[in-house]
């Protein structure tokens, strides 16, 4: 099947963005990541107007939905390129754009360092031997699966890169530490930061729950983290 691939390109934050279109003639079972790799393998790479263009900048690593590096807007929805297959998308025109909530690096690459900086500010580490409650094993496992891809932040109406609100990714990852830390002073510090950087800023739209590319039980983890940090339950 022949697909038209529309890509929003931009050389840097200071330059203007523009659209380029490419043709992909291949299997509907191809992933968006496969499409991008195939386009960049062309020598030279030409757009649909016949112009020779530079390779498309995008990030990838595992290619099997394990790292979150390839997060981007696919048909205006944040998804992972490696696990989004053409047959799951409507029509023969595929639109690719960078995530909009993070500073642009180039083309489809963004700088997600604010995500990790927010986790550092929450000080999510253990200062005591972990308390392993068997009743929380399943949600702790789900919390650890988070790819930190940023899709939940992209759709969150309360998150901005310049704000204090850290978003669902912080609450999901906080759950393990809030339930494993036994040192009361450190736990109180984490709880205070959690209230400031998540609980007080969450509008409870739960758009983060529906968008998670690996289907984490985000709502459940938010509820559990809130209970642990705010009410000590």
Language-model features: locations:
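A basic, amphipathic helix-loop patch mediating RNA/tRNA/ribosome contacts
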Residues: 40-75
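Glycine-rich phosphate/adenylate-binding loop and adjacent beta-alpha elements
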Residues: 72-96
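Short, thiol/selenol-centered motifs that function as redox-active sites or metal-ligating centers
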Residues: 5, 67-70, 149, 156
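Eukaryote-biased recognition of intrinsically disordered, low-complexity regulatory segments
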Residues: 1-22
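Ferredoxin-type iron-sulfur electron-transfer modules in oxidoreductases and energy-metabolism complexes
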Residues: 30-51, 92-233
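Residues in well-ordered beta-strands of folded domains
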Residues: 6-8, 25, 83, 97-99
């Amino acid at each position: 099947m022949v697909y038209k691939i529309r890509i929003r390109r931009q050389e840097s934050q200071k330059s203007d963005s523009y659209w380029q279109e490419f043709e992909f003639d291949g299997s509907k079972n191809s992933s968006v990541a496969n499409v991008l790799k195939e386009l960049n393998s062309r020598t030279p790479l030409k757009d649909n107007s016949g112009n020779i263009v530079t390779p498309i900048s995008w990030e990838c690593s595992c290619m099997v939905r394990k790292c979150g590096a390839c997060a981007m807007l696919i048909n205006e929805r944040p998804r992972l390129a490696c696990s989004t297959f053409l047959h799951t998308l409507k029509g023969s025109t595929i639109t690719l754009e960078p995530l909009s909530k993070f500073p642009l690096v180039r083309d489809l690459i963004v700088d997600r360092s604010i995500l990790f900086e927010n986790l550092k500010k929450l000080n999510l580490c253990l200062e005591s031997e972990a308390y392993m409650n068997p009743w929380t094993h399943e949600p702790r496992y789900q919390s650890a699966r988070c790819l930190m891809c940023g899709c939940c932040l992209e759709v969150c109406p309360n998150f901005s890169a310049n704000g204090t609100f850290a978003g669902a990714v912080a609450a999901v990852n906080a759950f393990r530490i809030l339930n494993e830390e036994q040192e009361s002073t450190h736990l109180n510090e984490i709880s205070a930061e959690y209230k400031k950087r998540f609980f007080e800023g969450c509008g409870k739209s739960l758009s983060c729950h529906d968008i998670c590319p690996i289907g984490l039980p985000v709502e459940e983890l938010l509820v559990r983290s809130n209970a642990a940090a705010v009410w000590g339950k």
